UniProtKB/Swiss-Prot annotation:
This enzyme's EC code(s): 2.1.1.166
Subcellular location: Cytoplasm
Family, per entry: Belongs to the class I-like SAM-binding methyltransferase superfamily. RNA methyltransferase RlmE family.
The protein's name: Ribosomal RNA large subunit methyltransferase E
GO cellular component, as recorded: cytoplasm
Predominant location: cytoplasm
Active-site residue list: K183
Source superkingdom: Bacteria
GO MF annotation, one: rRNA (uridine-2'-O-)-methyltransferase activity
Catalysis performed (reactions): uridine(2552) in 23S rRNA + S-adenosyl-L-methionine = 2'-O-methyluridine(2552) in 23S rRNA + S-adenosyl-L-homocysteine + H(+)
Purpose of the protein: Specifically methylates the uridine in position 2552 of 23S rRNA at the 2'-O position of the ribose in the fully assembled 50S ribosomal subunit.
Keywords, ordered alphabetically: Cytoplasm, Methyltransferase, rRNA processing, S-adenosyl-L-methionine, Transferase
UniProt keyword Transmembrane helix present: no
Length: 227
């Protein structure tokens, strides 16, 4: 994958102020309009700029191969599931080469993806995923993040809690030598979780894709080869 964005960079777009638009929503809109990865995703058919983050993770660590079972937590709008579907060459009629995606928000169908419109934190959701998975997973991936508050310490802790929940679930469903990928925000409180992950996986890395905004504290935890 190339990160050459020369064909996707537009002139800076200014956003007119509006009485109905908050400062934060105006800033978000300005970032979207001037983000080359947003433009690239639109042109290349990906549902979100987050697709390029997973592509970069794969380019770095080579985790995805055909004939895999993958669980995608917090999947909407489907960018990561799209990428995974392409990388494992998923199809709608394969039992051993499939992706199970979970989110409260609906996503449009993707080849080889079985979507569950559920709250991951509801009591029966894990049981349902395990039932649909019908065996052990090769990869559990989570791009879940809490709604940001603008307070970095709060956002850090909230997203870390989501990562911890995803990690505990991954331990239940991953096969030996399976992999776990999850978003966290840097902030200092992640060290305890990292130590737990290192006890369960042979290799644990931090990775910040170039497609992650430079001002963001997000990084990705990449845990390789479950013990």
């Amino acid at each position: 994958m190339t990160n050459n964005l020369s064909g996707y960079r537009n002139k800076f777009v200014r956003v007119k102020t509006s009485k109905k638009r908050t400062v934060s929503s105006g800033n978000w809109l300005r970032r979207q309009l001037n983000d080359p990865y947003v433009a690239k995703a639109r042109i290349e058919g990906f549902r979100s700029r987050a697709a390029y983050k997973l592509l970069e993770i794969h380019e770095k660590f080579k985790l995805f191969t055909p004939n895999m079972k993958i669980v995608d937590l917090g999947a909407a709008p489907g960018g990561w599931s799209q990428v995974a579907s392409k990388l494992i060459k998923a199809s709608d009629n394969s039992l051993n080469n499939k992706i199970i995606s979970i989110d409260l928000l609906e996503i449009e169908p993707i080849i080889g993806v079985e979507f569950l419109q559920k709250d991951f934190f509801e009591e029966n959701t894990e049981e349902l995923i395990i039932q649909v998975l019908d065996g052990k997973a090769d990869i559990v991936m989570s791009d879940m993040a809490s709604n940001t508050t603008g307070h970095k310490a709060t956002d850090h802790i909230r997203t870390l809690l989501l990562c911890e929940q995803a990690f505990e679930f991954a331990l239940k469903v991953l096969k030996p030598s399976g992999h776990f990928i999850a978003k966290i925000f840097r902030g200092g409180a992640e060290n305890e979780l990292l130590n737990k992950v290192k006890c369960e996986f042979k290799t644990v890395k931090h990775f910040k894709p170039s497609s992650s905004r430079s001002e963001s504290t997000e990084i990705y935890l990449v845990a390789i080869n479950k013990k």
